[in-house]
Amino acid sequence: MSKINHISYWLFLVLPSALFFEKIVASTLIAVLFLIKIPIIFQFKTLKLLIKQKILLFSILYFLLHAIALLFTIDIEDGLYSLEIILSFLVLPLIGITFKRNNKPLQINRHFVEKLFYVFVSVGFLAIALCLCNAFYKVNFGNGSKDYWFFYRGLAHPLWQIHPIYLAYYLNFLLSILLFHDWNLKWKFREYIKWILILLTIIFLILLSARTPLVVSFIILILFIYHRLKVHKVALALTTLSLLITSVLALVFTNNRFKELFNENGILQEDRVQTWRGAYEVASDHFWFGIPKGDLDDELEKVYRKNNHTKGLERSYNCHNQYLQLLCYFGIFGLLYFILWLYYVYRATIDNHLIFQLLVFSILIYFCTESIMSVNKGIVFISYFFTLIAIYEK
């Protein structure tokens, strides 16, 4: 049993780093962990511990609500597929609670988290190096366009065509680790190396040009200036304002991803606003109890067609807002349940770890512009860290 506990400990530790690779890698790790932990998961002592963990119960309930919604959906096939996608919200809490029964050296504590940070940062920079090397090769030896390979989808392409938004989310977390974690390293040039890596991460995030993660990066940097450098509040306010104005002007006038937000008259024309309007229209029509996932896509398609939202129709856009997505799925009661879940997660981070607190804060912002909990790369990321926060031993 001791050997199995060691194996599961390390598999659980490397799981978030597997998100930089093809999604089958993380899915395989979760499946192996579940098979290893089955004998422990369904023991009475484990289930008794689970009942005391509100965050884990909320996660499992999220899966069960989708399962119950299958009874009311017209499109069973799509509903079953969505249930398969969110399986991590059921499986990872069941895996996670078993670590509560481990001996102290194999529990989820600060030693575990420190190892996780080392692995995540190392794999993250391997991913950055791979993307930059691929871009350099394509531009200089493959007759590729610099505007494509050093930018957005082209830059993220070698990581099994991961969507740049999700890569940027992971790098936001990596940036938080670099800035706020106290590294126990005795390297001679430790601080120089650290700041070179921070600068490289910021440059890479700018090249990726994922807008919401750039906003989050800016907030993380401001919080670092305030918390770690102990800057006077007036100086901080002036610095923040200066950086904000400079950043906005630089990005809007030099980056196509930001230029396309406005038309020639300077009026906002972002298609995401049209998507939100359509999603809100669907949510308003099913305000109290929502509409099952299997039927939501059809309803959104009808609204997009009615509102002439061509891009949303062609690309089958979801709500692009997790709060709206939940309102559409389960109505106002489902949204209130979701907010309560997030409250418990955030409250747990206040007492245990600043970096986790930043992570949850970042996720709350991501939810405003993406339906992260509808995509595998986002589902595993969120279900893993919500579980980790719940089982973390101070």
Locate the predicted segments by residue.
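Transmembrane signal-anchor hairpin modules in multi-pass inner-membrane enzymes, especially those
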Residues: 1-77, 98-114, 118, 183-192, ...
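Juxtamembrane membrane-water interface segments that cap and precede transmembrane helices
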Residues: 8-12, 146-160, 309-323
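Membrane-embedded alpha-helical segments of multi-pass membrane proteins
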Residues: 21-43, 83-94, 166-175, 214-222, ...
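Transmembrane alpha-helices of multi-pass inner-membrane enzymes
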Residues: 32-37, 356-368, 372-394
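Hydrophobic transmembrane alpha-helices and their immediate junctions
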Residues: 38-40, 122, 193, 226, ...
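A membrane-periplasm/extracellular boundary helix in multi-pass inner-membrane enzymes
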Residues: 64, 129, 228-268, 277-285, ...
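Alpha-helical transmembrane segments of multi-pass inner-membrane proteins
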Residues: 111-145, 150, 159-228
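Long extracytoplasmic/lumenal interhelical loops at the membrane interface
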Residues: 263-277, 281, 285, 289-330
